[in-house]
Curated annotation (Swiss-Prot):
A Pfam family annotated for this UniProt entry: SH2
Domain SH2 stretches: 60-154
Subunit structure of this chain's protein: Associates through its SH2 domain with ligand-activated receptors for stem cell factor (KIT) and erythropoietin (EPOR). Also forms a stable complex with the Bcr-Abl oncoprotein. GRAP is associated with the Ras guanine nucleotide exchange factor SOS1, primarily through its N-terminal SH3 domain. Interacts with phosphorylated LAT upon TCR activation. Interacts with SHB.
SMART domains assigned: SH2, SH3
GO MF term (any one): epidermal growth factor receptor binding
A biological process from GO: signal transduction
Protein name: GRB2-related adapter protein
Family: Belongs to the GRB2/sem-5/DRK family.
Ranges for domain SH3: 1-58, 158-217
Membrane topology value: Peripheral membrane protein
Function (record text): Couples signals from receptor and cytoplasmic tyrosine kinases to the Ras signaling pathway. Plays a role in the inner ear and in hearing.
Gene3D superfamilies: SH2 domain (3.30.505.10), SH3 Domains (2.30.30.40)
GO cellular component: COP9 signalosome; cytoplasm; cytosol; nucleoplasm; plasma membrane; presynapse
Species for this entry: Homo sapiens (Human)
């Protein structure tokens, strides 16, 4: 996960991470605190205020969802190579890549060197974004030709990709998306008649369809 600093930030506590406007930071954990993310810059980790940064769009990032839910989501996408990246349930800051293999879903643990680089096999990457881009054109599997492919859009009608919250919603588990009445949510997927998947304020998760109204922007 990459983000760009909108403003400079000076750390005032030992666990905070200082950065300058324009810096690109790696987000390690955005699930545990509403206002602070854990991030890394030039090999140093610490907490940063989320309102000082802009998270780059990551439709493939699904947050801390379970392995089972990842499989359910990907098996509903009927194309080989459909994928998502999720945060480990047991080890915050660690990630897995889940990939549709056609008849099943395979999971790859993303490993990290001491220097902070990410890898699955031999190639090393500075960020998850670089890893994803590499495996779009290089097979992620060893015994089959499988390339990462973005989810095919399910929302075809103009203006139907956004919804406005009609009520407050508080997530009951890490896979869900909290929001306040009036918030605008980007709808990423409609895997279920009652639950949609969307993004708001840099977070991605599931929310009840009955709490929102599609809007034209």
């Amino acid at each position: 996960m990459e983000s760009v600093a909108l403003y400079s930030f000076q750390a005032t506590e030992s666990d905070e991470l200082a950065f300058n406007k324009g810096d690109t930071l790696k987000i390690l954990n955005m699930e545990d605190d509403q206002n602070w993310y854990k991030a890394e810059l030039r090999g140093v980790e610490g907490f940063i205020p989320k309102n000082y940064i802009r998270v780059k769009p990551h439709p493939w990032y699904s947050g801390r969802i379970s392995r089972q839910l990842a499989e359910e989501i990907l098996m509903k996408r009927n194309h080989l190579g459909a994928f998502l990246i999720r945060e480990s349930e047991s080890s915050p800051g660690e990630f897995s890549v889940s990939v549709n293999y056609g008849d099943q879903v395979q999971h790859f643990k993303v490993l990290r060197e001491a220097s902070g680089k990410y890898f699955l096999w031999e190639e090393k990457f500075n960020s998850l974004n670089e890893l994803v881009d590499f495996y779009r054109t290089t097979t992620i599997a060893k015994k089959r030709q499988i390339f990462l492919r973005d989810e095919e859009p399910l929302l075809k009608s103009p203006g139907a990709c956004f919804a406005q919250a009609q009520f407050d919603f508080s997530a009951q588990d890490p896979s869900q998306l909290s929001f306040r009445r009036g918030d605008i949510i980007e709808v990423l997927e409609r895997p279920d008649p009652h639950w949609w998947r969307g993004r708001s304020c840099g977070r991605v998760g599931f929310f009840p369809r009955s709490y929102v109204q599609p809007v034209h922007l």
